[in-house]
């Protein structure tokens, strides 16, 4: 079940932020910025330690007021020798609301600009990992909301510096456990540093037993000592060098997002698309609906969709006006009275933030829909619609991405320095250090020896005449959806399983029967809507979705084939999942901290189907 995040309650004691829950202050009464710089940055040898590095990773055990992050970000900005990319991972059980951060940060005018940017990107307070891109993506904040031990266990990263913060050991015993120090040792890069304000014996002992060489330093202000440490233990095997050139096969949202994430990490990308332009398949629909999922058990699909949805809200805004989308809200009506009762009870138990999802009664549902709908439902105020093609074009608009269209890939050939991509006649199309298969069902054909249970499901959307439903200003769903659009409302979508057509065929010609099914969906959502137009005024568009039995995507390294990766099986959640999964795959390929929990990454990895491997 979803664990509710309880925000911190802001109090001040003598002008210093104070936690009544822990009976401790958030920083020294002698000055917060000075403490951050002396104890944590200087304690970890920063900024000198990151000089000339391509990337540098900091992990903090308590985000608190965000002071250490702001001080580190400011130091990175001010340093001409700064690394190209700064990752800052921080865990927090009780995060502040953005408005409270504004009150706290007002004490530190030197961070005013950074604070405003941070608060403008502050995530909804929901459990899990939240990847926040700042400074054009050169600074990556991964905010992990939840219990520290659980969050840190899910981190996949190689850490260069640890900020051990999070209230005094005798006030926050849940954090300062032996497991914490074991986790630090597992995550530490060779020679990683650590710093903390405390010199308590259990902390010194825990660090020492985990392989850190510790030393006391002069403390800050009235505190006599603080502590620094350097990891001298045994590290995990070093990560292979990141590829310089990656070929991405497939120009839909999965491939476009992966290509952009890779090029943003300094990798040269060639994208091969078999059609005449990107976004010609399912990614070519006039609009697509984006919204989160809710489930009582908070399963993998729910957690992945939540993380991806929240990431989209920030990332799409950063792409600018070239992305056509609207946070108009999605009203999802209950199917029947029994379903309504279950959904209302579930929402009450989960206690989600109202701006994420809330229950609305029949009267409010009718107000939101501007229609006499027949059921109450769940309202997702931050959700809405997006034009998938505009997303693809925005992601691919980068000089480091070489787009090649009309390139049908026949097979892949492993070569000494990577991979060769061949057409169906055996002619070379490209060579690359690594390859990403983002070509839906066809990924199975190119990944020799794999037997992923990818299959296609045909889906058709139906375009209504322009002006036929002028009242509809937001997406309304109920076993289907109707969405506003520039060319007229769009109704969708059919989910046609193989019993209705040949398994894995490529028939995308519109079908009258599919339009009829969509119009029946429309009538169930908006009673009387089909009387606004005649049926021969509608038009259909069909495409094929690649899906898997567990309804999760297929993202990660292909087992036994070094340098080969896959991003497929996004089904009907492609626009929601693609951005964050592209980031995750690019981080995996380049050896950077992952933006998702390790358990989620395992849940979407190709290795989960290892037992299905083909034999010769």
UniProtKB/Swiss-Prot annotation:
The keyword Oxidoreductase applies. Signal peptide: none annotated. Keywords: Cytoplasm, FAD, Flavoprotein, Methyltransferase, Multifunctional enzyme, Oxidoreductase, S-adenosyl-L-methionine, Transferase, tRNA processing. It catalyses: 5-aminomethyl-2-thiouridine(34) in tRNA + S-adenosyl-L-methionine = 5-methylaminomethyl-2-thiouridine(34) in tRNA + S-adenosyl-L-homocysteine + H(+). Its main location: cytoplasm. One of its GO terms (molecular function) is oxidoreductase activity, acting on the CH-NH group of donors. It is found in: Cytoplasm. Residues 249-616 are annotated as: FAD-dependent cmnm(5)s(2)U34 oxidoreductase. Residues 1-232 are annotated as: tRNA (mnm(5)s(2)U34)-methyltransferase. Its cofactor is FAD. One of its GO terms (biological process) is tRNA wobble base modification. Its EC number is 2.1.1.61, 1.5.-.-. GO terms for cellular component: cytoplasm. Pfam families: DAO, Methyltransf_30. Catalyzes the last two steps in the biosynthesis of 5-methylaminomethyl-2-thiouridine (mnm(5)s(2)U) at the wobble position (U34) in tRNA. Catalyzes the FAD-dependent demodification of cmnm(5)s(2)U34 to nm(5)s(2)U34, followed by the transfer of a methyl group from S-adenosyl-L-methionine to nm(5)s(2)U34, to form mnm(5)s(2)U34. NCBIfam families: MnmC_Cterm (TIGR03197), PRK01747.1-2 (NF002481), PRK01747.1-4 (NF002483), tRNA_MNMC2 (NF033855). PANTHER family: SARCOSINE DEHYDROGENASE-RELATED (PTHR13847), TRNA 5-METHYLAMINOMETHYL-2-THIOURIDINE BIOSYNTHESIS BIFUNCTIONAL PROTEIN MNMC (PTHR13847:SF283). In the N-terminal section; belongs to the methyltransferase superfamily. tRNA (mnm(5)s(2)U34)-methyltransferase family. In the C-terminal section; belongs to the DAO family. This is tRNA 5-methylaminomethyl-2-thiouridine biosynthesis bifunctional protein MnmC.
């Amino acid at each position: 079940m979803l664990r509710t995040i309880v925000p911190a309650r802001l109090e001040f004691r003598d002008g210093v932020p104070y936690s009544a829950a822990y009976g401790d202050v958030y920083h020294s009464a002698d000055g917060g910025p000075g403490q951050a710089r002396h104890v944590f940055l200087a304690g970890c040898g920063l900024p000198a330690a990151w000089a000339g590095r391509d990337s540098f990773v900091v992990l903090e055990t308590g985000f608190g007021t965000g002071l250490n992050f702001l001080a580190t970000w400011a130091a990175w900005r001010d340093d001409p020798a700064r690394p190209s990319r700064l990752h800052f991972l921080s865990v927090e059980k009780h995060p502040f609301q953005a408005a409270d951060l504004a009150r706290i940060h007002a004490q530190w005018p030197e961070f005013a600009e950074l604070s405003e940017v941070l608060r403008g990107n502050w995530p909804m307070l929901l459990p899990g990992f939240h990847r926040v891109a700042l400074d054009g993506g050169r600074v990556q904040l991964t905010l992990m909301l939840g219990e520290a031990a659980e969050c840190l266990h899910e981190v996949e990263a190689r850490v260069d510096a640890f900020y051990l913060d999070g209230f005094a050991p005798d006030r926050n015993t849940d954090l300062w456990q032996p497991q914490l120090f074991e986790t630090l040792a597992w995550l530490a890069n060779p020679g990683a540093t650590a710093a903390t304000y405390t010199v308590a014996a259990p902390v010194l002992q825990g660090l020492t037993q985990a392989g850190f060489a510790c030393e006391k330093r002069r403390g800050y202000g009235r505190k006599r000592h603080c502590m620094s440490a350097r990891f001298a233990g045994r590290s995990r095997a070093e990560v292979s060098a990141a590829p310089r050139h990656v070929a991405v096969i497939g120009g839909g949202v999965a491939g476009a997002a992966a290509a952009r994430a890779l090029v943003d990490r300094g990798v040269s990308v060639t994208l091969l698309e078999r059609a005449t332009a990107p976004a010609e398949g399912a990614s070519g629909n006039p609009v697509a609906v984006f919204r989160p999922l809710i489930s009582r058990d908070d399963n993998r699909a729910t957690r992945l969709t939540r993380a991806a949805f929240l990431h989209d809200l920030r990332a799409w805004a950063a792409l600018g006006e070239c992305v056509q989308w609207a946070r108009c809200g999605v009203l999802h009506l209950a199917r029947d009275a029994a379903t309504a009762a279950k959904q209302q009870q579930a929402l009450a138990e989960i206690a989600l933030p109202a701006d994420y999802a809330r229950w609305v009664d029949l009267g409010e549902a009718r107000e939101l829909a501007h229609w006499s709908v027949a059921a109450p439902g769940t309202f997702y105020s931050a959700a809405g619609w997006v034009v998938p093609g505009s997303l693809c074009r925005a992601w691919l608009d980068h000089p480091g991405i070489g787009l090649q269209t009309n390139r049908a890939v026949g097979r892949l050939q492993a070569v000494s320095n990577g991979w060769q991509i061949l057409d169906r006649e055996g002619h070379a199309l490209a060579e690359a250090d690594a390859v990403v298969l983002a070509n839906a069902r066809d990924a199975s054909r190119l990944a020799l020896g794999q037997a992923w249970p990818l299959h296609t499901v045909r889906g058709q959307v139906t375009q209504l005449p322009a002006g036929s439903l002028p009242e509809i200003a937001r997406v309304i769903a109920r076993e289907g959806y109707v969405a506003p659009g520039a060319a007229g409302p769009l109704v969708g979508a059919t989910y046609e399983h193989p019993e209705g057509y040949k398994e894995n065929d490529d028939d995308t010609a519109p079908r009258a029967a599919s339009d009829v099914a969509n119009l029946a969906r429309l009538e169930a959502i908006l009673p009387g809507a089909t009387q606004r137009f005649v049926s021969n005024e509608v038009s259909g568009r069909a495409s094929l979705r690649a899906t898997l039995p567990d309804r999760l995507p297929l993202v990660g390294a292909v087992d036994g084939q070094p340098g080969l990766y896959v991003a497929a099986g996004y089904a009907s959640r492609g626009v929601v999942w693609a951005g964050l999964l592209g980031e995750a795959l690019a981080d995996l390929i380049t050896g950077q901290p992952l933006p998702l929990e390790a358990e989620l990454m395992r849940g979407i990895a190709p290795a989960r189907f290892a037992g299905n491997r083909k034999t010769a």
